[in-house]
Amino acid sequence: MYLRKPIQKIKSEVQIRLIRYYTASENAKVTYHEEMQNNFIATNIFQKALLTCGSAVIALLDPHRGDMIACLGEVTGENAIKYMHSKMLQTEEGQDILKNKPRINSKTIAFETLSQMPENSLGRVYADFMKDNNITADSRLPVQFIADPELAYVMQRYREVHDLVHASLFMKTNMLGEVTVKWVEGIQTKLPMCIGGGIWGAARLRPKHRQMYLKYYLPWAIRTGNNAKFLQGIYFEKRWEQDIDDFHKEMNIVRLLKK
């Protein structure tokens, strides 16, 4: 069983049940397959090639163009997404994710409740990260160019847990933190977009950050990507109450930075 020991407080138990009920009831309103069908845009090989070239150029010129980065990830990531899907099928936890297809947004996650959980819980770490960095869980674009609903969900899941990976690794949202997380994700998911982001993003680092990156962050990211459990197959929503130190130990993550 992948669930870990809950925090032994009645208040926390009530909070956890509310979070899970809220998540389940919202997810029941519309299936992911229905949403995917509404968002899907069919493309041929020529159109995919144009999208690949265009999105890559624009993303390089302006790393803040999330729409172009998302597009690039979809049109270049087919083999990597199939790999991610196969990795998720290898564990009970990953299978549960693929079966339930949970979503992470402001309608499915009670962030106010998470923010009241014990300080060292995964849920609190995530809520504090989102608040401190002024991030909304609704900022992740829907998948548009992947025809297979199962693979489309895997890509959607990758996007929606990205901030959770940031938070659980204690990585900031600045360029240094983003590049570091991209390397961890790239090693684990094999997504060309992540690997490219790690390479090209590093070229944009300022001298001081570049020195820190080469000496500390890059070696740590490579070790973490190779040694940690497959983070895309972790059912974070069922672990809100888990102590972050216990989470790191279970995931085989050696912390680079303190919270």
From Swiss-Prot:
Pathway stated in the Swiss-Prot or TrEMBL entry: Cofactor biosynthesis; ubiquinone biosynthesis
Localization per Swiss-Prot or TrEMBL: Mitochondrion inner membrane
Cofactor needs: Zn(2+)
Root EC class: lyase
Membrane topology type: Peripheral membrane protein
Annotated EC: 4.1.1.130
One GO location term (cellular component): extrinsic component of mitochondrial inner membrane
UniProt subunit comment: Component of a multi-subunit COQ enzyme complex.
Family, as annotated: Belongs to the COQ4 family.
Function: Lyase that catalyzes the C1-decarboxylation of 4-hydroxy-3-methoxy-5-(all-trans-polyprenyl)benzoic acid into 2-methoxy-6-(all-trans-polyprenyl)phenol during ubiquinone biosynthesis.
Any further remark recorded for this protein: This protein may be expected to contain an N-terminal transit peptide but none has been predicted.
The protein, known as: Ubiquinone biosynthesis protein COQ4 homolog, mitochondrial
Organism name: Bombyx mori (Silk moth)
